[in-house]
């Protein structure tokens, strides 16, 4: 087995990406566990395509051996909570739910409804409080060296430039399905009888919080349906947000 990588290990991201480029998504997961062991964790949003990565985990030797974090902002649609419960039961998942130390009511009292201002700075603050800080605190608490997400290069301009593994806020981020197309996601879900998010049937292709997600239109697709197109990233997958 390869030498484990932890927070103190020096690494060469170019060399690591070379190791990953010809591996399947399942092999990337196994590689990640070999490299990082208990210092590896996963994130899920229980969004449109979340079942794919969760099913891959449960189909591998990582089943019930790694932490899976779900960031509950307190503003998720009812359908997302119901979908999460469905997948947790169907896939026998052990989920760690992460929440901000600041309740939604307290945040609104202090800062107002940040998502209503149509101001990018306010949206960044919202993401920092409700998503980035809870994740960073959990990663630190459990000494996570590398966290795995289900981002894909087709989703946003920022993600089109991503590599399979690279540093995000002083930790490594691993992306097993980075190169998957929407078609591959659809057929994987179909072949493995994975249920669709309830809002998929209502025209949603990307789902975050209830107040900032909308169904697709003829002119607005994918993550452009989030926050009225002002922002396509929630802050978790970029380096701009710092604790």
Regions found by a protein language model. Give the residues of each.
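Nucleotide-activated chemistry modules centered on ATP-dependent adenylation/adenylyltransferase
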Residues: 2-243
């Amino acid at each position: 087995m390869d030498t484990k990588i932890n927070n103190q290990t020096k690494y060469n991201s170019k060399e690591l990406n070379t190791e990953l480029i010809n591996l399947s998504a399942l092999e990337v997961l196994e590689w990640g566990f070999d490299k990082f062991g208990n210092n590896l964790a996963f994130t899920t949003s229980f969004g449109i395509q979340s079942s794919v990565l969760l099913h891959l985990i449960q189909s591998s030797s990582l089943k019930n051996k790694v932490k899976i974090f779900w960031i509950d902002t307190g503003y998720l649609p009812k359908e997302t909570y119901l979908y999460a419960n469905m997948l947790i039961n169907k896939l026998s998942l052990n989920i760690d739910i992460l929440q901000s130390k600041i309740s939604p009511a307290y945040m609104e009292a202090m800062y107002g409804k940040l998502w209503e201002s149509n101001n990018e700075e306010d949206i960044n603050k919202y993401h920092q409080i409700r998503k980035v800080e809870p994740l960073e605190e959990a990663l630190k608490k459990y000494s996570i060296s590398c966290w795995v997400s289900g981002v894909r290069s087709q989703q946003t301009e920022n993600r089109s430039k991503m590599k399979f593994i690279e540093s995000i806020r002083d930790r490594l981020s691993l992306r097993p399905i980075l190169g998957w197309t929407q078609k591959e996601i659809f057929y994987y879900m179909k072949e493995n009888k994975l249920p669709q998010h309830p809002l998929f049937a209502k025209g949603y292709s990307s789902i975050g919080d209830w107040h900032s997600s909308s169904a697709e239109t003829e002119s607005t697709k994918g993550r452009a349906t989030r926050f009225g197109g002002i922002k396509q990233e929630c802050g978790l997958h970029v380096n701009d947000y710092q604790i």
